[in-house]
From Swiss-Prot:
Major place of residence: endoplasmic reticulum
InterPro entries: Exostosin, Exostosin_GT47, GT64_dom, Nucleotide-diphossugar_trans
Domain of life: Eukaryota
Tissue expression profile of the protein: In wing imaginal disk, it is ubiquitously expressed.
Effect noted on mutating residue 821 to D: In botv514; induces defects in wing patterning due to impaired movement of morphogens
Any single biological process term in GO: protein glycosylation
Name of the protein in its database record: Exostosin-3
Topology term for the membrane: Single-pass type II membrane protein
Lumenal side: 77-972
Gene field: botv
Residues glycosylated per entry: 218, 606, 643, 843
A molecular-function term among this protein's GO annotations: glucuronyl-galactosyl-proteoglycan 4-alpha-N-acetylglucosaminyltransferase activity
């Protein structure tokens, strides 16, 4: 039997097996005994037999072990290796068997088997990898879902806190409603009389001379809630002139037209409080053919047609007494004698020494014994146009100092008139002052050279006008001050004197009225003439030059500005004069004016169409953990609360500061604030103090509105033009905005919105209004659907966070009379232009003068002023350029308040991702804005914009606070 060989791992037979029983290291000798050989062969045969019996299980066990090790090795390698390593075969497989000892067929089968194993393992590994990636994706999704749920939890918790706060606020409002003990005032309802005036006995001239409002006026026809109804006798149907006289056709037509625009006029005489009778200017029929405003005669070669003052009155008193509603004594009648073409005393005071009984006389010229203070009314002559813009008649306000310090042109008529010693001394001193050796220039002429337009014919002495209207206008434009001499013979007012005041104010020459303590000026009950003119007694004539030099530029420009405002509002036109007369009489009686008309809103949708709604995106613009305020139902601002007190307590402000006593407004930005303790002691209604009065940081701040005024909300007005998707995105971002009352979308396009357009449901009403036409002025229309004082004007592409909006709202509540907003701009002086002009500038600057209304809060009061008070030329310029409406609003507010706007937060511009390119990025846009600023300055007569060098941020911004406290706003 051949010897057995041990097969090593290398597959090589290197040594015969030891068959000896000793188990030594040496080989057996060839001469061993046969017994030993047999014993050895038997043992080997038995061992081989046992080996063959367990060979197959052992091989299988070994293969299983090898496969497990191989799989473990591959998996451990695959986890760290790139995917390409999966297809590589491990070199360890080569070490398990000696493939060189195998036959080719077995080797091929072995290779195929290993390939199959590899393929199977690769498939399993790919499945495991795919499963692992899916698990990782699921884990990532679940983690994201967890974060979303956490955010949702925070939002819900914040919403819950807001709801709790809202419930508390609602409970407070309920308690206030229960405890309310004052009437809830609203728009007044008219309480009108329904009968004609009762017949009374006529009164004598002596009794008429002592008439005052308490003994000659019937208050029973003028209820506080009547609205002051006024009836006009048609001058064509109820003429009160003598034969041969008639009223100028221009005056009759214009008066009826202007009164037709007045809200107080009624057609039914039964409802009237007062009755207007036009008694003048009455001229001879031949004089009506003349066109010269100041002519009293025909040409010089013609015979004068002047009636005497005593025996020829152009008013037929019997016709006056026979008016259908005269009532026997003329109670509640107003006699209008408006001078226009003839300014001489005999024509402008036809009612002198006539018994007008209880009727109120309204005219320019009064004798001292004729005028009844507090009853009769002095008005300026009608020297202007019927109405409309009058800014072109005025001169620029700057520079403060003009060529001449003081000017006067006049001549005493009739020439044979004599002066008293004081008046003669005044003229002598003025002549010496004009000849004095000073650098100041004077024009003081007391004789007309060349001859005046005004011819002889006045029987009463007075200082007549020299030259033509254009020559006087040019001189006054070069005058810093204009001297006004009083009428002679102790008259309290004359038409010529008032004409001088009219012309001086129109040209920006500050009137210096000598003898003002002896005179009565127009509307003196309401207009504060001390803010418009220098009122001096005659005794101050020797100190006149010193006083004029003592006036500083700021005071001089303030006088000039106030004079122009008074002229524009109360003197400039027939419309202004008539409206002021009615307002003055109404003010005497303490009756509120008519409510200012609002623009009736017209929806773009018809009454049957219901627009589609969509859920708005939630949580895009606000931090979920920041509570900005409670959720409240819509709460309109209380309106018309001060109907019967504002003109009693703030009449001077209404007439001289706001310059608008003609309308009653729902609210004013000038309404007074209560003392701090009043909100806790008896006047708590509506107030929501921080921490119920204890104050606090961010948490308490977010729960209450606080401040110095009762709770209120704001309305967003958004102008849009054919940018539906941009509009929808902007509306969606307003969801959940605290203190938002309503959104008003002004649809400026002639095309209606698409029927399938989905409007986001943001929790408050969204009114989509049809604009009358495509105009940027529509942004500031005072729509009746705007029911709050605060109005946030925004562009449809402005992107504002909720905290920014609310901070701006809170700041506006402390600056209600100003523009409060985000993007700041300024007007810069063009140094390269020798004539000087303004440039609009949007660069970053430490000083600004405008806040653009593309994102700004304004009071609704300014919407009324922009629509009804702002000169039409400015609104026309806005339409011409389709630009500059925001500049116009800044001009208006600064003009009224003399204050700059307030900028909030650090935002300078507003980027709208994905929005179409706006017009503001065009260079033409900026060139037009340069022109707008300079044009608006010419219209106003000066540039009312004022500079500011600070912006507003919240109190605790960038302040270190304890960890258990919150800031007012996280990012502001």
């Amino acid at each position: 039997m051949p010897p057995a060989y041990d097969l090593g791992h290398s597959g090589e037979a290197y040594q015969p097996l030891d068959t000896g029983s000793g188990g030594g290291n040496e080989a057996c000798a060839p001469n061993s005994s046969s017994a030993q050989i047999r014993h050895s062969m038997g043992f080997r045969t038995s061992w081989m037999r046992q080996f063959r019996r367990y060979k197959l299980p052992m091989v299988l066990l070994m293969l299983l072990f090898l496969v497990s090790c191989l799989a473990y090795r591959i998996l451990s390698v695959e986890q760290d290796a790139p995917p390409l390593d999966l297809h590589r075969s491990s070199p360890l497989l080569d070490a398990y068997e000696d493939f060189s000892a195998m036959r080719a067929g077995d080797l091929k089968m072995r290779i195929e088997e290993m390939v199959r194993i590899k393929s199977t393992v690769s498939v399993e590994l790919r499945e495991l990898e795919s499963r692992r990636q899916k698990l990782q994706s699921d884990i990532s999704q679940y983690n994201q879902k967890i974060e979303e749920l956490k955010q949702e939890l925070l939002r819900e918790q914040t919403e819950l806190e807001r709801l709790k706060i809202s419930v508390e606020q609602a409970q407070v409002a309920q308690r206030e409603a229960v405890q309310r003990n004052t009437p809830d005032l609203a728009l007044p309802r008219s309480l009108l009389p329904n009968t004609l005036p009762r017949k009374s006995n006529p009164i004598t001239g002596g009794m008429a001379a002592s008439c005052e409002m308490h003994n000659c006026f019937n208050h029973s026809r003028c209820s506080l809630t009547s609205g002051f109804p006024v009836y006009l006798y048609d001058p064509d149907e109820h003429s009160v002139q003598r034969k041969g006289y008639d009223i100028d056709g221009f005056l009759k037509t214009t008066l009826k037209q202007t009164l037709g625009y007045n809200a107080h006029i009624v057609k039914d005489p039964k409802h009237a409080c007062i009755y207007l009778v036009l008694v003048g200017e009455a001229l001879l029929e031949q004089d009506l053919l003349r066109n010269n405003r100041y002519a009293a005669q025909e040409a010089e070669h013609q015979q004068p047609s002047t009636p005497t003052l005593e025996n020829d009155c152009p008013v037929d008193m019997e016709k006056l007494y026979s008016l259908p509603y005269w009532g026997g004594d003329g109670r509640n009648h107003v006699l209008l004698n408006l001078a226009r073409r003839d300014l001489t005393s005999h024509r402008t005071n036809p009612l002198y020494r006539q018994n007008t009984m209880r009727a109120i006389v309204v005219q320019s010229a009064f004798e001292r014994e004729q005028f009844r203070p507090g009853y009769d009314l002095i008005v300026p002559p009608i020297l202007g146009p019927p109405g409309g813009d009058v800014w072109q008649e005025c001169a620029e306000m700057v520079p403060a100092r003009r060529k001449y310090l003081l000017t006067y042109q006049g001549e005493l008529r009739p020439k044979q008139s004599s002066l008293n010693p004081l008046d003669a001394f005044i003229l002598e001193h003025l002549a010496d002052m004009a000849k004095g050796a000073t650098q100041d220039q004077f024009v003081l002429q007391f004789q007309c050279v060349p001859a005046t337009e005004q011819q002889e014919g006045d029987s009463l002495p007075d200082w007549t006008l020299c030259g033509s209207d254009s020559s006087r206008r040019q001189l006054l434009k070069d005058s810093t001050f204009s001297l006004i001499l009083p009428p002679l013979n102790g008259r309290v007012s004359s038409t010529l004197m008032l004409a001088r005041i009219y012309e001086a104010l129109r040209s920006g020459a500050v009137p210096v009225i000598l003898g003002a303590d002896e005179l009565r000026l127009p509307y003196a009950e309401t207009v504060d003439w001390r803010r418009t003119a220098l009122l001096l007694p005659k005794a101050r004539i020797t100190e006149l030059h010193f006083l004029l030099r003592a006036v500083q530029d700021a005071d001089l420009l303030l006088l000039r500005r106030q004079g122009r405002l008074i002229w524009e509002r109360y003197l400039s036109s027939v419309q202004a004069t008539v409206d002021t007369v009615i307002a003055s009489l109404r003010d005497r009686l303490g009756i509120p004016p008519r409510p200012v008309p609002s623009v009736i809103a017209q929806s773009v949708f018809n009454s049957t169409f219901i627009p589609l709604k969509s859920d708005p995106p939630v949580g895009l613009d606000t931090e979920p953990e920041e509570s900005l305020g409670p959720i409240e139902p819509p709460y309109p601002s209380p309106a018309f609360r001060r109907n019967y007190t504002i003109l009693r307590m703030q009449a001077k402000e209404a007439w001289n500061d706001w310059l608008d006593p003609f309308y009653l407004y729902p609210q004013l930005p000038f309404d007074p604030a209560l003392p701090s303790e009043a909100k806790f002691m008896g006047s708590h209604t509506g107030f929501r103090p921080i921490g119920k009065g204890l104050g606090g940081a961010g948490k308490e701040f977010g729960e209450s509105l606080g401040g110095n005024y009762p709770r209120e909300q704001f309305t967003i007005v958004m102008l849009t033009y054919e940018r539906e998707q941009v509009l929808m995105d902007s509306l969606g971002r307003l969801y959940g905005l605290p203190y938002l009352h309503k959104v008003v979308v002004v649809w400026n396009s002639p095309k209606p919105p698409l029927d399938d357009l989905r409007w986001p449901d943001i929790g408050v009403p969204v009114a989509v209004l049809r604009a009358p036409r495509n105009s940027l002025n529509n942004r500031f229309l005072p729509f009746d659907v705007i029911e709050t004082e605060a109005v946030l004007s925004v562009d449809d592409d402005a992107h504002l966070r909720h905290d920014e909006i609310l901070f701006g709202f809170r700041v506006w509540r402390e600056h209600r009379d100003r523009v409060v907003g985000f993007p700041g701009r300024y007007h810069a002086w063009d140094l390269g232009n020798p004539n000087g002009q303004w440039h609009y500038n949007s660069n970053y600057s430490c000083e600004l003068s405008m806040v653009l209304t593309g994102a700004a809060f304004v009071h609704k009061y300014y919407l009324y002023l922009y629509t009804y008070h702002l000169p039409q030329a400015i609104r026309d310029k806005v339409d011409e350029y389709m630009n500059c409406e925001d500049i116009a609003m800044n001009f208006l507010v600064s003009h009224i308040t003399r204050k700059p706007p307030v900028k909030v937060t650090s935002r300078w511009t507003f980027r709208c991702p994905g929005c179409p390119v706006s017009l503001s990025e065009d260079d033409t846009h900026f060139q037009e804005r340069h022109k707008c600023i300079n044009f608006f300055s010419r219209v106003f007569g000066y540039t009312p914009l004022l500079n500011t060098q600070y912006r507003a941020d919240s109190i605790l911004f960038k302040t270190r606070i304890p960890h258990d406290k919150q800031k007012c706003f996280k990012y502001i």
